[in-house]
Amino acid sequence: MHKTRLALSCLLGSLLLSGAVHAAEALVPPKGYYAPVDIRKGEAPACPVVPEPFTGELVFRSKYEGSDAARSTLNEEAEKAFRTKTAPITQIERGVSRMVMRYMEKGRAGDLECTLAWLDAWAEDGALLTTEYNHTGKSMRKWALGSLAGAYLRLKFSSSQPLAAYPEQARRIESWFAKVGDQVIKDWSDLPLKRINNHSYWAAWAVMAAGVATNRRPLFDWAVEQFHIAAGQVDSNGFLPNELKRRQRALAYHNYSLPPLMMVAAFALANGVDLRGDNDGALGRLAGNVLAGVEKPEPFAERAGDEDQDMEDLETDAKFSWLEPYCALYSCSPALRERKAEMGPFKNFRLGGDVTRIFDPAEKSPRSTVGKRD
């Protein structure tokens, strides 16, 4: 009996120590985020004026306003109003992504300083922290967090340590990311399963990016928990019931669900948490079903109420940016790798920018990743 108690005591102590060590370990991104800054001759473009920090109510019209339950018919008037009101948010998302890509590629200090000036201005004003919002507003909050924290990660973890000379700005920015991340968690927690869809997956990516950028494990843990829920929603054939509700856009929304889930899985694996086995390999099953559906959409049409699938979105190569983390997580076939190379390089500002340079840096386009004008 004494030996049994001693063994149990030792086992408990070992588990507690293991948990403490795990909790103490700093959160890290996938290895591609450690890439050094390339240095080229020349000056950065003049720093544009900072987009007005958005501190007001996050209450916006939905571009699907007036649509039926499938939420698949575009309301052009509402979309125009939405884009006008959210312009400052979209400007900082796209602008930060563009400047970080350009800085990592060309190493011009002006791009780094401009990026930090923009983020610092929004941080100091407490942008995106309002508790007055509607569904479209809280959606914009999590998209913006994923975009900004996702791009910032490349600066924070680069082996060139570009943030070392800007400790105060980095501290303010990261503190702001953590606050926005906490609010995103409040926005998207405790939803009934029937309301958990791609929005929750994108919220998980945003919180994961913020968690790693700020080394806040509660944020990391929440993102992982949302992944568990998402994986549990994938049925045995690789369908997401709540995305099938989008009827003619069911396939497009299954595809749209994959980028954030792949990113969460990639970041989790970098920190010793392998999510690929969740629900008997749900993530791989979902990806395989989407790839098959792109070639033969009839199964999606059948499951979505005999609705012919709208393939317009799927004709845009950038919609498949999830292939980069996918092929880092799984053994992609030579044919799929060749297809990925033909479609890339992939740049998705909502994932923090140039996803190809992060996950498959050998697969670079000969042209600039930020366009000829840059």
Swiss-Prot record:
It catalyses: Eliminative cleavage of alginate to give oligosaccharides with 4-deoxy-alpha-L-erythro-hex-4-enuronosyl groups at their non-reducing ends and beta-D-mannuronate at their reducing end. GO terms for biological process: alginic acid catabolic process. GO terms for cellular component: periplasmic space. Substrate binds at S62, K63, H135, T136, Y253. It comes from the Bacteria. It is found in: Periplasm. GO terms for molecular function: poly(beta-D-mannuronate) lyase activity. Its EC number is 4.2.2.3. Keywords: Lyase, Periplasm, Signal. It holds the Pfam family Alginate_lyase. Residues 1-23 form the signal peptide. Belongs to the polysaccharide lyase 5 family. This is Alginate lyase. It comes from Azotobacter vinelandii. The gene is algL.
